[in-house]
């Protein structure tokens, strides 16, 4: 997990700036990643530890339409917001998220796996958190762990330990 420490830190910093400046974190995924996007949004809204203010976070998904999260992001996200896109599948979610970012709306954080089709090289724009490639069930577990770490880092940045 050392290989994802810096991208997680960069993603937490970007989300912190977004929230401090009055933005919203939009969490999106398709297929199995929908549940993890909901988890991330709920964790930011509700917290998992001591009482704290809710953070503006929204999960975008539609089980019947894999294009829905990206349509919703285009309609709702504004400059200063952040889109956290998850893809443990074939790269189609990455393509949708990159399309939203190309439209000039939110900052973009991609959480996927090494070798995912369409995953851009690691860098600052977008921020890429590339998990080690693994069987799908293990990859979803790694995504959940990475999201837990990301949300914790955001909370520490905003509220201290």
Predicted regions and their residues:
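Glycine-rich phosphate/diphosphate-binding loops and the adjacent beta-loop-alpha structural elements
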Residues: 17, 23-31
């Amino acid at each position: 997990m050392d290989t994802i420490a810096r991208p997680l830190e960069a993603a937490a910093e970007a989300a912190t700036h977004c929230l401090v400046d009055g933005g919203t974190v939009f969490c999106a995924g398709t297929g199995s990643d929908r549940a993890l996007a909901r988890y991330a949004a709920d964790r930011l809204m509700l917290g998992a530890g001591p009482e704290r203010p809710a953070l503006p976070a929204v999960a975008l998904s539609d089980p019947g339409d894999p294009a829905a999260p990206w349509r919703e992001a285009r309609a709702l996200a504004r400059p200063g917001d952040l889109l956290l896109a998850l893809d443990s599948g074939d790269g189609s979610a990455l393509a949708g998220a990159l399309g939203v970012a190309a439209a000039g709306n939110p900052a973009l954080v991609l959480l996927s796996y090494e070798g995912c089709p369409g995953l851009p090289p690691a860098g600052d724009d977008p921020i890429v958190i590339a998990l080690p490639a693994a069987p799908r069930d293990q990859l979803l577990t790694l995504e959940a762990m990475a999201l837990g770490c990301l949300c914790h880092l955001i909370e520490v940045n905003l509220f201290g330990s």
